[in-house]
Amino acid sequence: MRVVYSVEEVEIPKGVSVSIERTGPFDYIVKVKGPLGEVTKEFKNTPVVMSLQDGKIVMEVFKARKREYAILGTYKGILKNMFLGVTRGWRYKLKVIYTHFPMLVKVQGNQLVIENFLGRKSKITLNIPKGVKVEVKGKEDIVIEGIDRELVSTFAAAVQAATELHGDERPSPHGREGGLGVVDGIYVVGYEHIKS
């Protein structure tokens, strides 16, 4: 069933400025500025019409079906994350877990380097995206911070995925004699805001 018209409004927090630029018939660029910096997102081929009205971002959709409602909800979540990013920031925490071969994780320039994963001689290197700050605390903790949640969470997931075993490398989930198997890796253990 189609609904002729639906609208969602997102309140702009105090201390945050927003600009919406229409770049094509169905394309928008939204810029959000706050005390911690600026986040820019591009919305392409969208059925949603965006505008600024009375301190709110108004999103309208015409002849909406389930897909359009889903997009409306997704955009609302993205905008709220942008507001939280420029006012409070995002911090993801990762834990380095190893049982036999001690893994060494360090930041070199704009790369995160993982050495001695499962005793391998080859290094795993990941390029740190612009706008993301990575800090290695001790031997077991990694902290990833930034104002763009999409960038920060995607990089945290990439770090975890870099130490996952795939295909023939992956041992039995029960390991030898019914043990845990290989638990070595880097895992996302939580996230929080930089400012409370």
Swiss-Prot record:
InterPro entries the UniProt entry points to: Ribosomal_uL6-like, Ribosomal_uL6-like_a/b-dom_sf, Ribosomal_uL6_a/b-dom, Ribosomal_uL6_arc
Pfam (any one): Ribosomal_L6
Record-level Gene Ontology MF annotations: rRNA binding; structural constituent of ribosome
Gene Ontology cellular component annotations, sorted alphabetically: cytosolic large ribosomal subunit
Keyword flag Calcium: no
UniProt record, GO biological process: cytoplasmic translation
Gene3D superfamilies: Ribosomal protein L6, alpha-beta domain
Keywords, alphabetical: Ribonucleoprotein, Ribosomal protein, RNA-binding, rRNA-binding
Source domain of life: Archaea
Alphabetical list of PANTHER family matching this protein: 60S RIBOSOMAL PROTEIN L9 (PTHR11655:SF16), 60S/50S RIBOSOMAL PROTEIN L6/L9 (PTHR11655)
Family membership: Belongs to the universal ribosomal protein uL6 family.
UniProt cross-references to HAMAP family, sorted A to Z: Ribosomal_uL6_A
Function: This protein binds to the 23S rRNA, and is important in its secondary structure. It is located near the subunit interface in the base of the L7/L12 stalk, and near the tRNA binding site of the peptidyltransferase center.
Assembly and interaction partners: Part of the 50S ribosomal subunit.
Protein name stated in the entry: Large ribosomal subunit protein uL6
Species this protein is from: Pyrobaculum aerophilum (strain ATCC 51768 / DSM 7523 / JCM 9630 / CIP 104966 / NBRC 100827 / IM2)
UniProt lineage: Archaea, Thermoproteota, Thermoprotei, Thermoproteales, Thermoproteaceae
